[in-house]
């Protein structure tokens, strides 16, 4: 199991700091499949490819550019990750969550994380936006396994409110103001890259999940460990396997994300102004 030392996180942060000319991000945004266009709206952008940052892995998923975009968005100092890392790409949980700790060292206090996922709740429809209230992770090791990096947080962190209640209320008010229907529910993590089987989807529903996907949870756990506030959104790009009698298609997921882009962008920007 690959682990990183506090010094390695510092080296990555120092490399980024040298490129930022004093800029300090307050909010980290991690954007999911088909949702990366928000990064193109950042004002006075400073773009840093992941490959320029020591110890940082690169993104190989379709539609994930693999770069940090620093700048102003909705009146806030932000850093947008255009493209995230996934364990199905062969990266460890430590790799996937590595950027969160690096950006925490640069000053980010809030994480806004988005993903594209399959709806398990039969009351949902493709295209719905879901506010994440909690998550389920039953597979694999934790991103906090191994020696604890005490500079970031305690050995046994509390996970009872990973998704900050006050930020969820901000999201509700923003959605109401924009007249954007907003679902709420539990996101369940599956490692992928294969989509879930109908039996797995039925199990997820029994356990209380409303959507299933392959990201978000590792980053949210590490952010909570770092003491960051977390706000999470899921775009239900499709109904999960077995809900409808049709196969799942990765291109359709990306297309659905692009189609929902304007609504999603408006909602996230409205939340940004209040977090």
PLM region descriptions:
Residues 1-159:
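Metabolite-binding pocket within alpha/beta catalytic cores that recognizes anionic/polar moieties
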Residues 214-252:
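Zn-dependent metallopeptidase/amidohydrolase metal-coordination segment
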Residues 174-210, 268, 275:
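Active-site/ligand-binding-proximal alpha/beta "capping" segment
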Residues 104-107, 205, 224:
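Non-catalytic positions within long, well-ordered alpha-helices that form the structural scaffold/packing
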Residues 136, 140, 146-193:
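Histidine/lysine/aspartate-rich catalytic loop segments that bind and position anionic ligands
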Residues 15, 19-22, 166, 170-181, ...:
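Generic non-transmembrane alpha-helical segments
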Residues 240-275:
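His/Asp/Glu-rich mid-to-C-terminal helical/loop segments that flank catalytic regions of hydrolases
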Residues 109-110, 210, 229:
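Short acidic/polar active-site loop segments enriched in Thr and Asp
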């Amino acid at each position: 199991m690959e682990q990183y030392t506090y010094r390695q996180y510092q080296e990555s942060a120092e490399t980024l700091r040298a490129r930022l000319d004093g800029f300090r991000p307050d909010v980290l945004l991690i954007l999911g499949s088909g949702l990366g266009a928000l990064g193109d709206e950042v004002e006075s952008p400073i773009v840093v490819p992941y490959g320029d940052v020591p110890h940082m892995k690169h993104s190989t998923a379709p539609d994930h550019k693999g770069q940090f975009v620093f700048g102003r968005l909705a009146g806030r100092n932000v850093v947008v990750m255009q493209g995230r890392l996934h364990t199905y790409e062969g990266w460890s949980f430590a790799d996937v969550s590595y950027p969160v700790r690096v950006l925490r060292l640069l000053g980010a206090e809030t994480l806004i994380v988005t993903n594209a996922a399959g709806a398990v709740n039969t009351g949902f429809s493709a295209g719905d936006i879901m506010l994440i209230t909690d998550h389920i992770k039953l597979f694999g090791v934790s991103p906090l396994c191994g020696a604890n990096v005490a500079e970031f947080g305690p050995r046994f962190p509390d996970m009872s409110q990973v998704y900050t209640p006050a930020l969820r209320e901000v999201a509700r008010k923003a959605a109401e103001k924009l007249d954007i229907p907003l679902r709420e529910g539990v996101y369940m993590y599956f490692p992928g890259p294969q989509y879930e089987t109908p039996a797995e989807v039925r199990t997820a529903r029994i356990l209380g999940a409303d959507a299933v996907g392959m990201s978000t949870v590792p980053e949210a756990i590490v952010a909570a460990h770092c003491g960051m506030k977390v706000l999470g959104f899921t775009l239900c790009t499709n109904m999960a396997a077995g809900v409808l009698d049709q196969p799942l298609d990765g291109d359709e997921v990306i297309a659905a994300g692009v189609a929902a882009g304007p609504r999603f962008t408006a909602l996230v920007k409205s939340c940004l102004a209040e977090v």
